[in-house]
Amino acid sequence: MGCLGNQLLIAILLLSVYGIYCIQYVTVFYGVPAWRNATIPLFCATKNRDTWGTTQCLPDNDDYSELALNVTESFDAWENTVTEQAIEDVWQLFETSIKPCVKLSPLCITMRCNKSETDKWGLTKSSTTTASTTTTTTAKSVETRDIVNETSPCVVHDNCTGLEQEPMISCKFNMTGLKRDKKKEYNETWYSADLVCEQGNSTGNESRCYMNHCNTSVIQECCDKDYWDAIRCRYCAPPGYALLRCNDTNYSGFMPNCSKVVVSSCTRMMETQTSTWFRFNGTRAENRTYIYWHGRDNRTIISLNKHYNLTMKCRRPGNKTVLPVTIMSALVFHSQPVNERPKQAWCRFGGNWKEAIKEVKQTIVKHPRYTGTNNTDKINLTAPRGGDPEVTFMWTNCRGEFLYCKMNWFLNWVEDRSLTTQKPKERHKRNYVPCHIRQIINTWHKVGKNVYLPPREGDLTCNSTVTSLIANINWTDGNQTSITMSAEVAELYRLELGDYKLVEITPIGLAPTNVKRYTTGGTSRNKRGVFVLGFLGFLATAGSAMGAASLTVTAQSRTLLAGIVQQQQQLLDVVKRQQELLRLTVWGTKNLQTRVSAIEKYLKDQAQLNAWGCAFRQVCHTTVPWPNASLTPDWNNETWQEWERKVDFLEANITALLEEAQIQQEKNMYELQKLNSWDVFGNWFDLTSWIKYIQYGIYIIVGVILLRIVIYIVQMLARLRQGYRPVFSSPPSYFQXTHTQQDPALPTKEGKKGDGGGSGGNSSWPWQIEYIHFLIRQLIRLLTWLFSNCRTLLSRAYQILQPIFQRLSATLRRIREVLRLELTYLQYGWSYFQEAVQAAQRSATETLAGAWGELWEALQRGGRWILAIPRRIRQGLELTLL
């Protein structure tokens, strides 16, 4: 029985210790290096100082560094808010640069165009004769291969084989102008591709023609004579956010576990050039060919090897003039009178294109997504068929003019195709292609929207570096594979920015610790200033273990706050400098929105900390128990980012518990503050407290009355139970009748135990008093038992620990003796070493002194011998003469 009692006592003590020290409580950390995906708007920065580019982006200062992180993150170029924003924003730049505001629907009327010109350029049926003649003539020609370079004469004079005149048609039309009640005749010049003419409905020398897009959409013209021109810009994250980049060379547009991650506040520079088929002047070209392949279809972006130096040089020859014609109020149409027939625009390709395309095919064969033929001879580069002109032609911009280039000659040259199945005009292998210009173009971003672009004056030339191509790769079962060039302009920006992802910094972390709120004393304030590494330095510990990162959480939180404030201030400064230019523009509103978002994020974090009672505290202990005892962090091997992913499902529950605990604590503090009012003696006589005093008095009176009633009922029950044994007790060993003599004169009367109360002279004390005595004795016995067991437990523990302490003490004494002996040996050895050194020094000194003395004597003897030589010679001569 005693052993069982000891075990029970030990179990109770262990449970008490566990309850005190092993319960985990929620601890709030502010400044942890963790993040989550975000979709907040980015802002752009650029160095371009032209008017429209400056109004769209903030000035760029090149102060953007990258920091490597020891983390693993997933990246996707297609499901990516950075690329989606770039696609949308480049379109906004394009739309803002041309500023469409005037509807050209009044020009959707019948125009009388020069019939000879419409016949020549194939807009009427009469062109059949011309076309057939041309076909007959060309059919007799043989396959030609024309390769030109910078020094070729035709390049200088813009008269290379196959290039023609620019197809332009002059037209007349009548419409009401500034005077609405009178019609006026206007003369305009159109590109043939912008017109459609009625067939067989010509009168005399005129053909009936209309604008090409009148029946499909609303066409708008520029208000100002501005031109779309590409700029270089970069995207930057708002304060409180960051951009992660996958730095792995094997990244191909999708990687769930990229281990080479860097963080930055801004992206690399990006070119806003818009074109189909090719990407010009990109920033992702390397000394290798690599492919971004969409995860669910065959859309690809192929980055070309910059080693091959692939270029494209386009030119629109001629000295074109532009004449603004006011057609009606608020409608200025930019006409181009034909002073002399302009030559056709054209583009020339330079570099080792054949080897570059060959390497592209080899890279496709090696790609894990590709399952077609491995024979590169069966992989062909093809042009898309059908669709808008922007699809079938290579569409690009050259200093404001949009060129539509027919690429058959180029594909024949690169692929070295057989030309027997092609049309006569296409039966050539050339490294240049003819292009035509349109003023009414289909926008690449929104289907069915057309924009009129006024022609540009003068001779236009533009040189570009080809860095990638957009294509759809399709193959059959081991037979043929086609690399079909694509018009998905949006894919260009997936290659440029697809290795970035936008994340929101989540500096608030929740983790279990053994510390409960208000159980530890406050730490002393560190007076030394913290070296602020900048906002990116805050994420430097993202790959560190939670324990190491939490040790520097104070400095990290200060760095985080300083970085946010610094970025906000810089952003505000540049916005202020651009205040006038940013007015009423989409990008200006977007830039201001990023600043507001950053402030909202910081205030949101502080409001959340305040709701938990942790405002402006880096490490905040709480009284909320950790809800999942089996889920604890590995402080030495687990990062905060990994831990945040594991406890994401608990965040809502923990947040609610923290708020409830803070509300309860505030209530307790309120009650405590109410009690503090009694500290001042004068408050006791406050008039507002008199009503409370009256209430307390009434409560006391009612309590006294109730107590009297209870005492009366107890006394009544006691009288009724007098003389009876308690029904809930065993035979009362504690009950002993105490005989008393009521009257000494009366004889003693023996009464039986258990008899009812009588009027005899003998009676027993009430059993309740004896029962109380019994309880007291049992309590004393229990306390004695507890004391004896505790003493026994302590004595046994002492007996167990005493030998251990004795052995430990003996071991320490032996270690001390050994150390003292070793120290003595070392001291003796050191003294012996010192004596040896001194003896060696003395011996060396004596030896050197003796050697120096002998050397000095030898030198003296030699010197005397040398000095004596003349004297000996003289003495010898004297002896000889004698």
Swiss-Prot record:
Keywords: Apoptosis, Cleavage on pair of basic residues, Coiled coil, Disulfide bond, Fusion of virus membrane with host membrane, Glycoprotein, Host cell membrane, Host endosome, Host membrane, Host-virus interaction, Lipoprotein, Membrane, Palmitate, Signal, Transmembrane, Transmembrane helix, Viral attachment to host cell, Viral envelope protein, Viral penetration into host cytoplasm, Virion, Virus entry into host cell. GO terms for molecular function: structural molecule activity. It comes from Simian immunodeficiency virus (isolate Mm142-83). Residues 23-697 are extracellular. This is a macaque isolate. Residues 478-485 are annotated as: V5. A motif (Di-leucine internalization motif) lies at residues 881-882. A motif (YXXV motif) lies at residues 724-727. Residues 113-170 are annotated as: V1. Residues 674-695 are annotated as: MPER. Residues 637-669 form a coiled coil. The record marks 737 as: In-frame UAG termination codon. This is Envelope glycoprotein gp160. Residues 738-761 are annotated as: Disordered. GO terms for cellular component: host cell endosome membrane; host cell plasma membrane; membrane; viral envelope; virion membrane. Residues 719-882 are cytoplasmic. Residues 592-608 are annotated as: Immunosuppression. SUPFAM superfamilies: gp120 core, Virus ectodomain. Disulfide bonds join 44-57, 101-223, 108-214, 113-171, 236-266, 246-258, 314-347, 398-462, 405-435. One of its GO terms (biological process) is virion attachment to host cell. Glycans are attached at residues 37, 70, 114, 149, 159, 174, 187, 201, 205, 215, 247, 250, 257, 281, 287, 298, 309, 319, 374, 380, 463, 474, 479, 628, 637, 653.
